[in-house]
């Protein structure tokens, strides 16, 4: 029987499956951070259980950390308590932790790939919705809730149902100044923010094959924004080259054995997909969201849509509500709108290639005096690499603040946030109401 990549990985990890296709899946890698794990550890203690496989579990601090000061007390008492609990829990259960004093600390979805923890064919979970990022390596990766975090800690397995298969083939030649972020935003705008609900999306096509691993991670990172369980890209030579000689990657004979297995990780030619789409990006322009959902997106040279042209009452009401919240009007250009802040960072766009691209645009330029702009590297390793290349100086000379690694302004869980009514051009993955701070407006 022909299988998709998703089906191959899923089937190879089934420990038990009942007649209703509900499975117990073995989990190869469990990633933790300070926000969604404390209750799970407390429940373990209450039930007198331990961590089943601490060597297949990894933790870091990222959501709450200060990007100004290397101190866990700098983000407030609640954040400090969560980080202290993570330290205690990792020590008690012998789980590796990259805390703020570790030179490699950073965003969990940046660290795991760059260190070679994320490998093709794995099942990977984390108490974070953007775990789909790791699907760029041909791994089945998805976010889980706190009760599921506890279950994986205790059993190294997870109860799951089978999802449908969706294929999105991306073709054409990428225009100048168009990035992977533009491509996935365009796809979300075209297909809708709920188009992937109940599915695992496999991205393929010549455009994907010519992308770097960092670009592929951006694509898969935002599969969740289509409502999908996860995103997947079959591994290839670009994947293998990226992984070779990473800290946690296989080496020696194990490297060759792993490579032999990874080369089998692709969908069969006549595998069945429940939905298939082909997207041509040859004429694509840079994309920007105007509303409070990811499918409320336009090209930078387009006007905000006329509500009278929206054929759905629900979508029309949503568009009106979004414009009211964002302080915008239909039939206007976003290029005429003043912004207050700029944020370059997050698990979507805080890797070295992202920083190189941004620095290339900013070189020998100055930002407007009224704008506060910050750039937050995705990890300590990314930060040091950028500094070796002199990118930090370009950012600082242009007027940006060069910060410490962390999730930062992607979400309002630390001191980096928007004030009420402030407008931000952000490289992060969500533009929801209040995402970057109460009353904040995110593009």
UniProtKB/Swiss-Prot annotation:
It is an enzyme of class 4 (lyase). One of its GO terms (biological process) is L-leucine biosynthetic process. Its cofactor is [4Fe-4S] cluster. InterPro entries: 3-IsopropMal_deHydase_lsu (IPR004430), Acnase/IPM_dHydase_lsu_aba_1/3 (IPR015931), Acoase/IPM_deHydtase_lsu_aba (IPR001030), Aconitase_4Fe-4S_BS (IPR018136), Aconitase_4Fe-4S_dom (IPR036008), IPM_dehydratase_rel_enz (IPR050067), IPMI_cat (IPR033941). Disulfide bonds: none annotated. GO terms for molecular function: 3-isopropylmalate dehydratase activity; 4 iron, 4 sulfur cluster binding; metal ion binding. The keyword Lipid metabolism does not apply. It catalyses: (2R,3S)-3-isopropylmalate = (2S)-2-isopropylmalate. Coiled coil: none annotated. Keywords: 4Fe-4S, Amino-acid biosynthesis, Branched-chain amino acid biosynthesis, Iron, Iron-sulfur, Leucine biosynthesis, Lyase, Metal-binding, Plasmid. It comes from the Bacteria. Its EC number is 4.2.1.33. The keyword Chaperone does not apply. Binds 1 [4Fe-4S] cluster per subunit. CDD domains: IPMI. Pathway: Amino-acid biosynthesis; L-leucine biosynthesis; L-leucine from 3-methyl-2-oxobutanoate: step 2/4. Signal peptide: none annotated. [4Fe-4S] cluster binds at residues 347, 407, 410. Belongs to the aconitase/IPM isomerase family. LeuC type 1 subfamily. Catalyzes the isomerization between 2-isopropylmalate and 3-isopropylmalate, via the formation of 2-isopropylmaleate. Heterodimer of LeuC and LeuD. This is 3-isopropylmalate dehydratase large subunit. It comes from Buchnera aphidicola subsp. Uroleucon sonchi. The gene is leuC.
